[in-house]
Regions:
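Intrinsically disordered or compositionally simple regulatory linkers and C-terminal tails
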Residues: 34-53
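Short glycine/proline-enriched turn or capping motifs at secondary-structure junctions
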Residues: 22-29, 399-401
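Active-site donor-binding loop signature of nucleotide-sugar glycosyltransferases
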Residues: 19-22, 34-36
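A residue-level signal for beta-strand positions that form part of recognition/binding surfaces
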Residues: 11, 28-31, 62, 73
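A charged, well-structured terminal subsegment
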Residues: 28-29, 35, 394-397
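A short beta-strand->alpha-helix segment at the C-terminal rim
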Residues: 1-21, 27
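Flavin-dependent oxidoreductase catalytic cores
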Residues: 50-415
Length: 415
């Protein structure tokens, strides 16, 4: 436990952590939507923020999952870098992940790493589908472990019907026919009018991919990763099985939520069987599809219960990106209520993600038990040393910078 006392002068800021001071928020409640196309606001959004006395900075308290102990509650979200060559990561990934680890983040999660070549979003996506990928990832992992006390996870996934596209800064649209590859999905439904129609998966496809996930887990262990996250959100392959908008199967893999969860659970069990018992597994889900007829938060609670019963250690609670319809414009912390409800009702630890801002927000999320960990993506793109800067801002005592950067702890920025 860090020997830091939360300053009394911060108390009022702490109590009112949830609403960002931007328009769209009201005192003690959350107003999420602008425009008219969004579905109705789930009833649990309208609730008073609980108040609780604080004496310490919750952001800088440790947290354990199985044999992995994190020094604080900050996680770097997996973010596709589109910088690999034939699936092999390189110096960019060493710097990208290594700098955030050196910057004080407790857990850095590598981008969605595809378990088969047809599962790539683009030609430049990272992979763990052939033996030569493992040593390249090991170089990244070794750097993080050698030069920081951070832990490093890998997000394993398959893009499904959202595969075979240009990289983000080239428009992210479907590749032309002479560069494209076949895509697969639970049902033959294209992601957008311009997208390739995926082939509906057979049982043989499922068995092949279950083994691909298992092999990727074995290589991830050889590379030294501390955690695996399964990408089960955002409209990629596993997410497409879960959502009723994208799974129209009439066999045992479609229909009821129990059936739609069959393939995700088969993947999880295969990974768990090939991953050390003392190392945790996470899964990212889209808890709310932002579309009529899609996944609702009640479903997310049930998913949390199923995954907890199967042995999942923590649920990374995101939302949306399942369909081509744009997500409604939202304010900060718009997904935290999903995490809070799943955590409370499913009884499983959660990570929250989505427009998480300053350290006061993170302190509030942890103290109010809305999530156990806070994922930050764009914020850590902007500031790789967010954790160090937060510790300085909060006045955390005995905070340790990397030895090479120790003098920075004495720097006092001028506003």
């Amino acid at each position: 436990m860090l020997g830091h006392m939360w300053r009394a002068a911060k108390a009022s800021k702490f109590v009112t952590w949830a609403p960002c001071p931007s328009k769209g928020w009201t005192s003690g409640a959350i107003s999420l939507f602008s425009g008219t196309r969004a579905p109705p606001v789930p009833s649990f959004f309208h609730q008073t923020i609980r108040k609780r006395p604080m004496t310490e900075a919750p952001m800088f308290t440790p947290f354990s999952l199985r044999g992995m102990t994190l020094k604080n509650r900050l996680v770097m979200s997996p973010m596709c870098q589109y910088s690999a060559e034939d699936g092999t990561v390189n110096d960019w990934h060493v710097v990208h992940l290594g700098s955030r680890a050196m910057g004080g983040t407790a857990l850095v999660i590598a981008e969605m790493t595809d378990v088969s070549p047809e599962g790539r979003i683009s030609h430049k996506c990272a992979g763990m589908y052939k033996p030569e990928h493992m040593p390249a990832w090991k170089r990244v992992v070794d750097f993080v472990h050698t030069h920081s006390d951070a832990k490093i996870g890998i997000q394993l996934g398959h893009a499904g019907r959202k595969a075979s596209c240009h990289v983000q800064w080239e428009g992210a649209g479907p590749l032309p026919a002479d560069q494209a590859w076949e895509t697969i999905a639970p049902s033959a439904l294209p992601f957008s009018p311009d997208s390739q129609t995926p082939r509906e998966m057979t049982r043989a496809d499922m068995e092949r991919l279950i083994e691909a996930y298992a092999q990727a887990a074995r290589w991830s262990e050889q590379a030294g990763f501390d955690m695996i996250e399964i990408h089960g959100g955002h409209g990629y392959l596993i997410s497409s099985f879960i959502s009723p908008l994208t799974n129209k199967r009439t066999d045992e893999y479609g229909g009821s939520l129990e059936n739609r969860m069959r393939f995700p659970l088969e993947v999880f069990h295969a990974i768990r069987a090939n991953w050390p018992e003392d190392k945790p597994i996470s899964m990212r889900i889209s808890a709310f599809d932002w579309a009529e007829g899609g996944t609702e938060v009640d479903d997310a609670v049930e998913i949390g219960k199923m995954m907890k019963a199967a042995g999942l250690d923590i649920l990374d609670v995101s939302s949306g990106n399942v369909t081509n319809d744009p997500r409604p414009r939202v304010e900060g912390l718009f997904q935290t209520p999903f995490s809070e409800r799943v955590r409370a009702e499913a009884g499983i630890p959660t990570m929250t993600v989505g427009n998480v801002g300053g350290p006061e927000q993170i302190n509030g999320i942890i103290a109010e038990e809305r999530a156990d960990l806070c994922c930050m993506a764009k914020g850590q793109m902007f500031d790789p040393y967010f954790a160090h800067h937060a510790a300085q801002k909060l006045g955390v005592e005995d905070y340790k910078w990397p030895n090479q950067y120790g003098a920075a702890g004495f720097f006092k920025p001028v506003d």
